[in-house]
């Protein structure tokens, strides 16, 4: 039986099972900013050699969050690591898997070279980026071991990460369901600045397997625009626009996002508005961040937006133990790619604040 057909049969069986147990479907998923802020702190902690200060500041003692394991493996031929850690709470009956983001400029460069087109089959779910697939395979055993511990078998699972960490989270979560370690309704995923991980076939399979999943995007963060999607050539940009075009929801050749985007067009300070991006194309809502045309020759603002979420510089915040008294430099002057943010936000019909 072909792999794609085997996966389709497996997926149909899985959906039948989940319907009996009351699957947590997309229509039930509600973005929780308080929860997202906590997961951002945990994602920041992954950049530190010692994650315990962030864990202690993120959760109350009553939740009894305990560090279960840490991992760091060589990701590529220059020795860049794929790393993360796993936290467990017996009180909440919850396991949280956290992946670290890009740590060095050389690693960012390698990601750029190898994310041009999804080309590696991911267990019959569709094609994904080879570099991300390699990182997933090298870290998977640590996740599998943790979720297979008998006393934790019924615990809910959260998966999170920033940047590269978000990409690894995006592969880890559907693999958990695919391998039968958890049912769909037991998993929640929130990522920050996640790049496109696979093609549209992977996107559709992911959405079925992990319905509670959000990609948080800060304004003009450049990374979620990479690798580029195939543009819908049937779309005619309006007169006077910058010529930006939506992703083609049919093409299987390029990158295509999965999960619901949560877009913050501003600086993500306390009280800033955000959008739940459920418009078309599905998972690539052209009324949200994908409406911005990114100039890869001038990415200062886009890189700043990528490193700064919820008012903190993510890697430095984690290295500083997630100390809320830390101060960070403000954003550069918003020009070019972000000049459209105000008008886009103003005409967007779906605002949840």
Swiss-Prot record:
Glycan attachment points: 32, 64, 267
Localization, UniProt: Secreted
GO biological process: lipid catabolic process
UniProt-annotated catalytic positions: 163 (nucleophile), 221 (charge relay system), 306 (charge relay system)
Enzyme Commission number(s) from the entry: 3.1.1.-
Pfam families named among the record's database cross-references: Lipase_3
SUPFAM superfamilies found in the cross-reference section: alpha/beta-Hydrolases
Gene Ontology terms for molecular function: hydrolase activity
The UniProt record lists the keyword Hydrolase: yes
Covalent S-S links between cysteines: 277-288
Broad class of where this protein is predominantly found: secreted
First and last residue of the signal peptide: 1-22
Classification via InterPro entries: AB_hydrolase_fold, Fungal_lipase-type
CC terms in the record's Gene Ontology section: extracellular region
Biological role stated in the UniProt entry: Probable lipase.
Record-stated family: Belongs to the AB hydrolase superfamily. Lipase family.
Name under which the protein is recorded: Lipase ZK262.3
Species annotation: Caenorhabditis elegans
């Amino acid at each position: 039986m072909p792999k794609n057909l085997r996966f389709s049969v497996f997926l149909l069986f899985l959906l039948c099972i989940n319907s009996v147990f009351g699957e947590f479907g997309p229509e039930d998923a509600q973005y929780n900013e308080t929860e997202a802020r906590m997961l951002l702190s945990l994602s920041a902690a992954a950049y530190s050699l010692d994650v315990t200060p962030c864990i202690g500041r993120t959760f109350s003692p009553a939740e009894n969050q305990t560090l279960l394991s840490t991992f760091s493996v060589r990701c590529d031929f220059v020795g860049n690591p794929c790393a993360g850690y796993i936290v467990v709470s017996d009180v909440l009956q919850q396991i949280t898997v956290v992946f670290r983001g890009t740590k060095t400029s050389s690693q960012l460069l390698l990601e750029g070279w190898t994310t041009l087109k999804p080309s590696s089959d991911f267990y019959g779910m569709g094609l994904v980026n080879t570099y991300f697939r390699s990182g997933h395979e090298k870290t998977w055993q640590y996740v599998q071991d943790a979720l297979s511990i008998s006393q934790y078998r019924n615990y809910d699972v959260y998966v999170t990460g920033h940047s590269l960490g978000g990409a690894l989270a995006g592969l880890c979560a559907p693999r958990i369901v695919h391998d039968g370690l958890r049912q769909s309704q037991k998993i929640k995923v929130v990522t920050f600045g996640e790049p496109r991980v696979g093609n549209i076939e992977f996107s559709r399979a992911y959405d079925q397997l992990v319905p509670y999943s959000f990609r948080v995007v800060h304004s003009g963060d450049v990374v979620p625009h990479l690798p580029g999607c195939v543009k819908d050539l049937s779309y005619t940009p309006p007169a006077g626009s910058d010529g930006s075009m939506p992703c083609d929801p049919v093409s299987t050749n390029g990158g295509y996002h999965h999960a619901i985007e949560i877009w913050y067009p501003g600086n993500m300070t306390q009280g800033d508005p955000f959008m739940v991006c459920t418009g078309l194309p599905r998972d690539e809502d052209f009324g949200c961040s994908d409406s911005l045309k990114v100039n890869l020759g001038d990415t200062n603002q886009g890189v700043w937006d990528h490193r700064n979420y919820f008012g903190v510089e993510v890697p430095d915040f984690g290295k500083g133990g997630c100390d809320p008294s830390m101060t960070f430099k403000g954003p550069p002057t918003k020009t070019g790619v972000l000049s459209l943010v105000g008008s886009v936000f103003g005409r967007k019909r779906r605002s949840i604040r």
